[in-house]
């Protein structure tokens, strides 16, 4: 539960008021209109979570208890006699030709593939179940190429029931299937991999999943290829209960000249469930060939467990302002207390700003503590002069971080955990690069829970992608020094297919440029819908529902936002289209397409630019409450010749009808507004309302004629 600390000094109140984001009553714009561009999604617009029991998925059908080594191994082709069964270990050794072996039956033990580097080796699973409680089930040590294949019309099962591998254990392998070399998981049958306490499938090189029906359920990474992960024409259900689901770690160039670190989807169907990031790529993410992907993170995955990392000896204080010092008074009684000064510890990026950590030692000899905030010129460790102080707090064993939040004239605090970047298992760090702290979603933890995250670029060329994430739906980082020597660009490009995002933070965030060339983009729920250094809508159908800004262009010069084609709809509680560019009449460019923007907040504008914007083509309708900042929407270089503004009352469920040149818009309003309607395209535009219409539109739907 959040606690409130009353600010004792007006200085702090004024400072926080000046620095905080001013929504002026924005917030939720009031309902989630369905949008008017015909986009469909399997993602619901509520807090529903997803994921069936493993038993219902059939993943536990092959589990057995007790000791078993009832297996049949056959040489299908290639070098015969290249295996041994020693106790409960099946070992494949050197082959002198490309070879295919099969295995069936039950094994309580392990498989080791160590066939040398000269020839390809395939292991076919033909109705095979194995359970391992001592070491990881399958280890691939060598081979020119190694493929583990689920034979057509067979069901196969691998269970890793070992205890969790300790962070200090440098010998044990965390993956149920672990490979030191490039690994292919393929076939026309089915394979279920269940790792109770560790990773799913891990290749220290390239990992390829092709054709088969694959289910992986594990604690940490379901699929991890240090160099790359490629999924092609497969059907996968991938579950990570405390970590990132699909992950790469390297971003250098291989000896063959190949860029490492990309996660690729080439056709197929994939369900991804993650407690942290759904996809975390060290380089790029690529979606192509009509791949179908559904991603659920954090609380939207039924499999997620709490992700915590509690320090044994340190507490932290976290705040998003740097100019303060802190002290803690440990307390048992008026005669038994101890003052401790907090020291600066670290800074973490929060996307729209930084978060500053101060640390102080835990002291279990005291039952309570009270923390004090001081300005930079105040003395620490005293209670006569300070900015704010808490009440007495009971020491926590479950949490190690006191997170401070400024809201209005108050400071709030809440217990959470300082989660650092975690060993080889791949948990998200403090938000991961590019913003996982409490941005638009004040309830986020300190680990990154994005749908798709890359350290460079994200490209969606075709297919269908549904994301329901507790953090940003899609996030591309820039400014990361990659192992190939370059600096990441952080671009997101959507050139086709269908993208549907429900996010508790940003729908799509590009540290670099966000471009929609074609396809459909439907942001069902978000804090800010589309955000990038530049945002370019060049085609396709784009629909955005946002609690704050619909589109935010962060560039401070040039055209931060360009609309040049397609259909754009925004329904938001902040600024509809918001450019930070200070270029005179250049921060936003409308040059084509059809745009409808609805802002429900009186303190914001449907179109907001620092120094005006430009219009050269297309049709624009901007709806917002009269007064306030609405005059920003008329700061257009062509407004006198191409613009029109009309004041009217728009009722919830009523229809707005705009006739602008050859275009006609009919819009069923999801909210009542004493509106200013700004249009661009024809200075003689007709703007009217009516109570009914023959098109049968639901609230929030529209049609262009």
Where is each model-derived feature located?
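Short, surface-exposed binding/anchoring microloops in extracellular/periplasmic proteins
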Residues: 305-333, 642-645
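Sec-dependent bacterial lipoprotein signal peptides
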Residues: 1-17
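Beta-strand signatures of extracellular beta-sandwich domains
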Residues: 325-329, 370, 657
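A short, solvent-exposed beta-strand micro-motif common in secreted/extracellular proteins
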Residues: 209, 365-377, 685-691
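A composition-driven surface/loop motif
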Residues: 8-10, 19-304, 419-705
């Amino acid at each position: 539960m959040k606690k409130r600390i009353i600010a004792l000094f007006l200085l702090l109140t004024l400072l926080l008021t000046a620095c905080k984001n001013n929504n002026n009553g924005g917030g939720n714009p009031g309902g989630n209109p369905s949008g008017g561009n015909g986009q469909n999604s399997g993602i619901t617009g509520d807090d529903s979570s997803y994921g069936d029991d493993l038993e219902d998925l059939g993943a536990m059908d092959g589990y057995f208890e007790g000791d078993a080594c009832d297996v049949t191994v056959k040489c299908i082709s290639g070098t015969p006699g290249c295996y041994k069964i020693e106790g409960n270990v099946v070992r494949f050794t050197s082959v002198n030709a490309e070879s295919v072996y099969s295995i069936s039956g039950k094994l309580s033990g392990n498989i080791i593939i160590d066939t040398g580097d000269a020839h390809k080796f395939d292991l076919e699973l033909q109705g095979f179940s194995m359970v391992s409680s001592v070491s990881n089930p399958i280890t691939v040590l060598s081979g020119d190429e190694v493929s583990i294949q689920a034979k057509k019309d067979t069901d196969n099962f691998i269970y890793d029931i070992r205890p969790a591998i300790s962070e200090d254990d440098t010998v044990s392998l965390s993956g149920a299937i672990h490979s030191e070399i490039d690994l292919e998981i393929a076939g026309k049958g089915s394979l279920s991999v269940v790792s109770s306490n560790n990773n799913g499938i891990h290749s220290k090189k390239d990992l390829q999943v092709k054709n088969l029906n694959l289910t992986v359920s594990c604690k940490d990474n379901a699929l991890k290829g240090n160099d790359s992960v490629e999924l092609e024409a497969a059907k996968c259900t991938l579950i990570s209960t405390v970590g990132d689901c699909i992950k790469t770690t390297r971003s250098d160039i291989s000896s063959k000249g190949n860029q490492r670190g990309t996660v690729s989807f080439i056709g197929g169907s994939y369900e991804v469930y993650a407690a942290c990031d759904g996809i975390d790529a060290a380089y790029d993410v690529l979606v192509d060939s009509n791949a179908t992907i559904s991603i659920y993170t954090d609380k939207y995955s039924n499999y997620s467990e709490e992700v915590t990392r509690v320090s044994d000896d340190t507490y932290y204080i976290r705040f998003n302002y740097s100019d303060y010092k802190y002290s803690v008074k440990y307390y048992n009684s008026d005669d038994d207390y101890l003052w401790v000064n907090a020291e600066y510890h670290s800074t973490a990026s929060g996307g729209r700003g930084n978060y500053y950590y101060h640390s102080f030692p835990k002291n279990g000899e005291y039952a309570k503590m009270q923390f004090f905030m001081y300005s930079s010129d105040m003395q620490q460790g005293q209670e006569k002069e300070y900015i704010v102080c808490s009440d007495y707090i009971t020491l926590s064993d479950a949490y190690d971080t006191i997170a401070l939040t400024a809201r209005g004239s108050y400071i709030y605090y809440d217990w959470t955990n300082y989660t650092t970047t975690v060993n080889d298992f791949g948990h998200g760090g403090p938000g991961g690069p590019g913003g996982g702290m409490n941005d638009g979603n004040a309830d986020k933890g300190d680990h990154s829970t994005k749908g798709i995250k890359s350290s460079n670029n994200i490209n969606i060329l075709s297919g269908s992608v549904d994301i329901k994430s507790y953090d940003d739906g899609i996030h591309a980082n820039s400014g990361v020094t990659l192992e190939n020597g370059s600096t990441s660009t952080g671009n997101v490009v959507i050139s086709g297919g269908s993208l549907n995002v429900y996010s508790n933070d940003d729908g799509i965030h590009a540290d670099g440029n966000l471009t929609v060339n074609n396809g459909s983009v439907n942001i069902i729920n978000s804090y800010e819908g589309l955000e990038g250094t530049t945002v370019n809508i060049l085609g396709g159908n784009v629909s955005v529902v946002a609690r704050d800004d619909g589109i935010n262009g962060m560039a401070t010069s040039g055209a931060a936002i360009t609309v040049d084609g397609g259909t754009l709809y925004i329904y938001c509680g902040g600024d509809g289209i918001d450019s930070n560019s200070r270029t005179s009449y250049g921060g936003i460019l409308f040059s084509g397409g059809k745009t409808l923007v609805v802002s429900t907040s009186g303190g914001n504008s449907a179109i907001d630019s620092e120094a005006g914007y430009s219009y050269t083509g297309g049709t624009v309708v901007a709806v917002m409450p009269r007064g306030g900042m609405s005059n920003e929407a008329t700061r257009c270089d062509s407004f006198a010749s191409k613009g029109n503004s009309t004041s009217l009352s728009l009722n919830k469920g009523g229809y707005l009808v705009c006739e602008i040149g050859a275009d006609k818009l009919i819009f069923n309003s999801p909210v009542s507004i004493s509106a200013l309607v700004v249009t661009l395209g024809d200075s003689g535009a007709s703007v009217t309302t009516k109570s009914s219409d023959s098109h049968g539109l639901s609230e929030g739907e529209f049609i262009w004629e």
